[in-house]
Amino acid sequence: MNFSKTLLKNSKDGISSVIFSPSVKNELIAGCWDGSLLHYQISENPELLGKYDLSSPILSLEYTDEKTALVGNLDGTVTTLDLNTRNHEFLGNHGKGVSCISKLRLENCFISGSWDKSFRVWDVRVKQPVEGQDIGKKIFASSSRDNILVLGCSERENLVYDIRNLKLPFQRRPSSFKYMTRSVCCNQNFEGFVSSSIEGRTSVEYINPSQEAQSKNFTFKCHRQIQKDYDIVYPVNDLKFHPIHQTLATAGGDGVVAFWDIQVRKRLRVLNPSKINISSISFNVDGSMLAIATCAQEEAAGNIYVHALESNFAAPKLKS
């Protein structure tokens, strides 16, 4: 399969989040600022399987299973949406917008983070929060892998939790950035995470507090352009690791997706699918497709693209 498809073009409202199904490799959902959730099947001739209208702009999304979505909205509500029956159920709410949702290792459990300075843990079977903490800082981004949960917060701080004890973080890590964190993403190949900011930078951080591990931390510039002798800096809005090669993809306000081998600290290649702000990206389960969503202040700025990737597209370069 070799194609590049546009699923949605020139939508009047931007796309806040796009995510592939964790089990069905050719299905994805996207959340929009007009409050609609879009459900697509991807092939040579993509099909819109459903459009579901919610009452508030969608900020965050996650699949709970192959036919159910967990949705976080600008008005603070958290709901589940059955993609088959179109039924949605109210689970609970935050006091402000739900900026992020992440799946936890615990069965059927998910975490939502909010601008109201709290997180909640939801068991979708009992349809109510089973745990939550007010942390005193706005939560901008979250990511979880194995027993680790990372929250990217206001006041230039990242909080690292063990999901078996969410009462207090076991690490409070000062951000590597001067300005706001936009995204965090845990990695399976090393005990750490990456984070990005609005200042055109990405940071690689190891959780092990040993001097040897901490010496491997580094920050690099990305998503910048030189125009008439000026360095134009763009936000790095999303971070995803390729599910097979574990190389890093960064998505920026410059309309570019860049691929990086963080083990050797090198950029591998770039995709230039858009001239406007990329808000969200997602790999499908086998890494053969990449979905790219855009969102900007201009009219008709909401687009969704899907690129089919060759098996070695995101692979690290072989050492000579």
Swiss-Prot record:
Signal peptide: none
PTM summary: Phosphorylated by bub1.
Acetylation found in the keyword field: no
WD repeats: 10-50, 53-91, 93-132, 231-270
Localization (cell): Nucleus; Chromosome, Centromere, Kinetochore; Chromosome, Centromere
UniProt xrefs under InterPro entries: WD40/YVTN_repeat-like_dom_sf, WD40_repeat_CS, WD40_repeat_dom_sf, WD40_rpt
GO BP: cell division; mitotic metaphase chromosome recapture; mitotic sister chromatid biorientation; mitotic spindle assembly checkpoint signaling; negative regulation of mitotic spindle assembly checkpoint signaling; regulation of mitotic cell cycle spindle assembly checkpoint
Gene disruption phenotype: Sensitive to thiabendazole (TBZ).
GO annotation, cellular component aspect: bub1-bub3 complex; kinetochore; nucleoplasm
UniProt keyword annotation of Mitochondrion present: no
GO molecular function: ubiquitin binding
Keywords attached to this entry: Cell cycle, Cell division, Centromere, Chromosome, Kinetochore, Mitosis, Nucleus, Phosphoprotein, Repeat, WD repeat
Major place of residence: nucleus
Family assignment from sequence similarity: Belongs to the WD repeat BUB3 family.
PANTHER family, per the entry: MRNA EXPORT FACTOR AND BUB3
Primary role: Involved in mitotic spindle assembly checkpoint signaling, a process that delays anaphase until chromosomes are bioriented on the spindle, and in the repair of incorrect mitotic kinetochore-spindle microtubule attachments. Localizes bub1 to kinetochores and suppresses activation of bub1 away from the kinetochore.
Subunit description: Part of the BUB1-BUB3 complex, composed of bub1 and bub3. interacts with mad3. Interacts with spc7 (phosphorylated on MELT motifs); to recruit the BUB1-BUB3 complex to kinetochores.
Protein name: Spindle assembly checkpoint protein bub3
Source organism per UniProt: Schizosaccharomyces pombe (strain 972 / ATCC 24843)
